[in-house]
Amino acid sequence: MGEVYAVGVGPGSARYITDVVKEVILYSDIIIGYKYTLKTIERLLVNKEVYEITMQNQEEIYQKVAKTLGDKTCAIPFTGDVNFSESEVVDRLIEIFGKVQIIPGISSVQVAAAKARVPLDKSKVITMHVTTSIEEKKLELQKALLDGYSVILVPRPWPKDPTKHFMQSEIAFYLKDHGFDTSKMKVHVFEFLTTDKETSFVGTVKDLECRQFSDLSVMVFDQTKPESYINFKTN
């Protein structure tokens, strides 16, 4: 079987695609990806065999390509970083194709943290963007906030099932229901990061109640306290 790559192509702007990922895509014969992801790399798709997938048909397409791959090279691009929020898909790709080479990309989490000026080394990163239960992740969010960490969080859009839908408004009510004073909690929400449609919101968690945001959004709970190296200088 030929080579198979899972690559991260950044949050949405072609400017955030790394050189190594560009090389892999240009080298590949077959590209399999979601519509939004393919749009990010559209200039690199000339003369490629391209398959646009959805959640409904992805298994069928992966199986089809696996059977006919031969000595060809296949790249499967993911929005952001392939190592974040995509483990369920990557695990399945490994089951289907065997060896899959993983090339990281720039995550919207990194961009959101930078824009909010919240350092990752003082933060907890949590993704609710999974199909499995998120109850433990909800507890993880509570603990991180109680422990004084900033939190960069990817919410879970699931509009067809309100019991699984856990976006900004649901998160705000959840935290309030669990004893947090959300009127005093600073939060950023970024949508469509790095693209022409990028928007940002800054306010309190309480402000998020009944407010709607895009599926392509990231939250940053800001509890950062500046600590420069000068504060730790010793004689």
Which residues make up each language-model segment?
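Secondary-structure boundary/capping motif
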Residues: 16-17, 85, 133-134, 162-163, ...
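A contiguous loop/helix-start segment that scaffolds small-molecule binding in enzyme catalytic cores
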Residues: 2-6, 74, 145-235
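Positions that flank functional sites
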Residues: 40, 108, 128, 159, ...
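Class I SAM-dependent methyltransferase SAM-binding "motif I" and its flanking Rossmann-like core
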Residues: 13, 80, 84-149, 199-202, ...
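Class I S-adenosyl-L-methionine
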Residues: 1-103, 110-111, 207-209, 217-218
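Structural motif
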Residues: 33-36, 54-56, 79-81, 129, ...
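A short, acidic, amphipathic alpha-helical segment used as a generic capping/interface helix at domain edges
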Residues: 64-68, 134-143, 173-175, 207-208
